[in-house]
Amino acid sequence: RLTLIFTGILCAFTIGAQQPKGLKKLRAAQVSVLAYTAGGELQQGQGTLISEDGIVVAQYDVMKGATRATVVDMAGNEHQVTEILGANGAYNIVRMRMEPGKKKNAYLTIAPQQPAEQAQVFIMPSEKADKNVPCTIDTVTHVEEFGDGFKYLTLTHEAGKRQANSPVLDQSGMLIGFVQMATKEGQPSYVIDANYANSLKVKAMDAGNSDLNSIHIRKALPETEEDAISFIFLTSKKDTAMYMDYVNRFIQLHPANTTGYTLKAEQEAELGQYAQAAATYETALKQEGTKADELHYSWSKVIYNLSMRPDYKQYDNWNLERALSEVQQAAAITPLPTYTMQQANCL
């Protein structure tokens, strides 16, 4: 109760103080985050748009365990969260993307420089606060560096509980970071660098990242083709829908990369979806830039492996003769020892 009274006094004090420029417009970048677990439990928090194309920074503990999530903007429009771009449970931060709306998204621009000790900062009210509520003014008492030159600020006062993850601005209205609450009540709050939040990305080895895997929403693939393929190879196939989602996304991003099609067709065949697998191979063979020999070889292996299974009920002409034909086409394009060995297997 004393904390609430103090916060109220502090807010009242800030009414007469100079606020960041264009505060009412800046508040349009604040959003509500509604995350739902597999059991239907609702977890709520606030987020901040940091780009025009829908990148949102939210609290990790709100997104943990979620199978789907919705972002509600200041106009009341709902946007589905389409992918997780990065996460860190220790710092309670998630970077994610929401689907675009009909209008351009309002967003906060990250400040080019972090404040020094004794600098004033402005904590925005929660996303649900009245539009006339001013920022809470606080002072930086300590600046600590972590990671790749990122800053972690200690404030003078404890922020209100509703301001957890609230954006923190400088006088010009640019984004410094996000409020983090102290572990003990009554202790000063902290600000984590917005640049750190924006740096969170999915890497090739993150298929086993427990923080990311605790959020059951598709992760963004790593930026390079090689890293994206490594990520998919390391991803568990237990969640078939998620695995296929990654493969389809890879094909969408890299339509000339043969591996995406072979991964898709092989998984479809493994699931008994033979017609779909055949269609995937046919599509890939028509796609400019793909390697036809690798596609024919993959198709041959799929048919051969199926033919070796006692429970396999032949689909169309998928037999050893067809498997041999496919690998012969591969060898005619590129005569590799691997293809010769596969021909011997099929005889």
Where are these regions (language model features)?
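Flexible, gly/ser-rich surface segments that form the specificity/activation loops bordering the active-site cleft
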Residues: 18-22, 104-152, 159-164, 179-190, ...
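A conserved glycine-rich beta-strand in the N-terminal activation segment of trypsin-fold
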Residues: 19, 36-53, 58-59, 78-80, ...
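C-terminal cap/linker of serine protease catalytic domains
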Residues: 19-20, 177-241, 248
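Conserved active-site neighborhood of the chymotrypsin/trypsin-like protease fold
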Residues: 51-122, 127-133, 157-158
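Alpha-helical segment of the N-proximal tetratricopeptide repeat
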Residues: 220-271, 311-313
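Short coil turns that delineate tetratricopeptide repeat
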Residues: 255, 289-291, 333-335
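Residue-level recognition of tetratricopeptide repeat
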Residues: 266, 301, 308, 345-346
